Structure formats: structure tokens, C-alpha cells
Amino acid sequence: DEVTIADTFKAAGYATGAFGKWHNGMQYPYHPNGRGFEEYYGFTSGHWGHYFDPVLEHNGALVRGSGFCVDDFTNKAMEFIEDSVKQDKPFFAYLPYNTPHSPMQVPDRFWKKFDGAELGMRNRDPKKENVQHTRAALAMCENVDWNVGRLLKKLRKLGVADNTIVVFFHDN
């Protein structure tokens, strides 16, 4: 019976879309489409096993993702935003990235920056230290940063950056 932020924006005439990890249920009414999102592209399970070309969901139908999932989620969100702007419709886009998170997979262009790099961070317990895992997590953060930058650039290109509120937070 809870009213979500997406329900509120939708009721106010906004286009609503979610692109990425949804960890709140996959069955209606807990599915994103049952929580105020007209457009949903992502995965609703608690964990995903492969981040390249994964099986994802688009409004209830299983589809094959395209490339690295975080890049794909960003692409779909930018398409949604562009379509909303073309229709002169305000939009609420929710883009919950799933990385950095296992499995520690990231596109080579981001991995290469950290592969073999000396790390200044160290685990307090040397027995628990996993340098390759840390490098992969840093590469994933670099990818998230790149994707957020692409999204902000898209907002500027569409001429809506000064009239758009962007909130960024992350739980990993």
C-alpha cells in the first residue's frame, strides 16, 4: 500500500523509468512496473552471475543485454531521457548500478588501468587481502564514474541539465 517516489512522479505526469538492479521483488506488485515505473530494464534478482551480455528483463520480458551491463543500463536510461525530452515530457529516471560487486568483471579498458598497479590501500588483515579483487573493484568504480559522466554530458547536450536534479549515491 506504500506510495513510491515513482508513483508520485507518474501521478504528476512524469515519464518514469528504472534501469539496473531492482532488489525489491520480481513479482507484481513489487516489480518496478508495479511500483510506478512505466519503463523497466534490468534485473530483479538479488545477485547476477555474469555482467557481459546478460539475460535481463524489459517490462516483464526476458531480453539479452548488450555488452557490459552498467554501460547498457546507462545507454537505456539515456535513450529514455532523450525520448522524454523529445516528447516535451518531464522525466524521473532511476539508475541503480550493481557494481562494484562480485562477480568482479569489468571491461578491459577499465581493467587495464589497474592491472598490476601498486595499491596504497591495504586490508588490516593481510590474510584477507585480495589485491586482484581490489583492483577489479577500483576498475568498476572507474566505469561507474565514466557512465555517470556520460549521463551528465547527455543532459547538457539535450539542454536539460540546468532543469534536472541529479542525485548520486551508492551502497557498495
Model regions: which residues?
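Formylglycine-dependent sulfatase
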Residues: 1-172
